[in-house]
A protein has these predicted regions:
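Short, solvent-exposed loop/turn segments at secondary-structure boundaries
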Residues: 88-93
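N-terminal Rossmann-like NAD(P)+-binding domain of SDR-like oxidoreductases, especially those catalyzing
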Residues: 1-84, 114, 126, 132, ...
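Short-chain dehydrogenase/reductase
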Residues: 50-59, 94-95, 121-122, 151
C-alpha cells in the first residue's frame, strides 16, 4: 500500500493531471523526543523495530509524493493524521478507543499497556474530514499535521470510557510493547495559519457519539 500502491496512484494522478492527497500519519515521528511534534521534526524511528514497517512505509510514501512533485510537477498534498476515532470505526481494528469501549461495554477488564502514563491526542472524525477538505482546497503542499493538540494519558482515557459507559470494568496493566511511543501530540500551528483549521469537538462529546454507535450497531 505504501510503496507499490502509492506508485500506482501517483502514476494514475500524473496520467490524468489530478490532484492527489497522501493520508500520512503521526507514526512518521516514531517515539518522538520533541513535544509537541512540528512538521519539520524528522522523527525518532527505530528502522528495525516491531512497528517500523508501518512507520517507514508512510515515510517512504511521503518521499515518493515529493519526488513526483519535483520530477513531474504533480499537484500533491500531504497531511499527517494523528489518532482519530468516531462512529463507523471498525470495532476490532485494535485501536485503543475501540478496544476500551468494547471492553467497557462487555464489562471486561480494560487493558492498558505500560503504566498508563503514555499519552495520545484524539481527534473526532468530523474534525479530520473538515481538515482534509480544507487541505485539498488550499494551495499548500504540506506536510501539515491534523490532530487534536490536547494530550491525554491512557489511564485517563480508560477512566473516562468507564464513566461514560457506566461500566463495572477494572483497569489492568500489561507490558508496554517495544518502541511504543511514550507521548504523541501535534503542533497544529500550520493547520491554523494555512488552513484556518483546528478541532472543535471535545473528547467527551466525541466519545459519547462513538459509544452510542457501538451500542446500536
Amino acid at each position: 500500500t505504501c510503496t507499490i500502491g502509492v506508485i500506482n496512484m501517483l502514476g494514475l494522478a500524473k496520467k490524468n493531471n489530478a490532484k492527489i492527497l497522501q493520508a500520512s500519519t503521526s507514526e512518521v515521528y516514531g517515539d518522538p523526543e520533541i513535544h509537541p511534534q512540528k512538521e519539520d521534526y524528522n522523527g525518532n524511528v527505530n528502522t528495525l523495530g516491531y512497528r517500523s514497517c508501518y512507520d517507514e512505509g508512510k515515510r517512504c510514501a511521503e518521499t515518493l509524493f515529493m519526488d513526483y512533485k519535483r520530477e513531474h510537477n504533480l499537484n500533491i498534498r500531504i497531511v499527517r493524521i494523528f489518532n482519530t476515532y468516531g462512529p463507523n470505526m471498525t470495532k476490532n481494528d485494535g485501536r485503543v478507543v475501540s478496544n476500551f469501549i468494547l471492553q467497557a461495554l462487555k464489562g471486561e477488564d480494560i487493558t492498558v499497556y505500560g503504566d498508563g502514563s503514555q499519552t495520545r491526542s484524539f481527534q473526532f472524525i468530523d474534525d479530520l474530514v473538515e481538515g482534509l477538505l480544507k487541505m485539498m482546497n488550499s494551495d499548500s503542499v504540506g506536510p501539515i499535521n491534523l490532530g487534536n493538540p490536547i494530550e491525554l494519558s491512557m489511564k485517563d482515557l480508560a477512566t473516562m470510557v468507564i464513566r461514560l459507559t457506566n461500566s463495572s470494568s477494572n483497569i489492568i496493566y500489561k507490558e508496554l510493547p517495544k518502541d511504543d511511543p511514550k507521548r504523541r501530540r501535534p503542533d497544529i500551528n500550520l493547520a491554523k495559519s494555512i488552513l484556518d483549521w483546528s478541532p472543535i469537538i471535545d473528547l467527551e462529546t466525541g466519545l459519547k457519539k462513538t459509544i452510542n454507535y457501538f451500542t446500536t450497531h
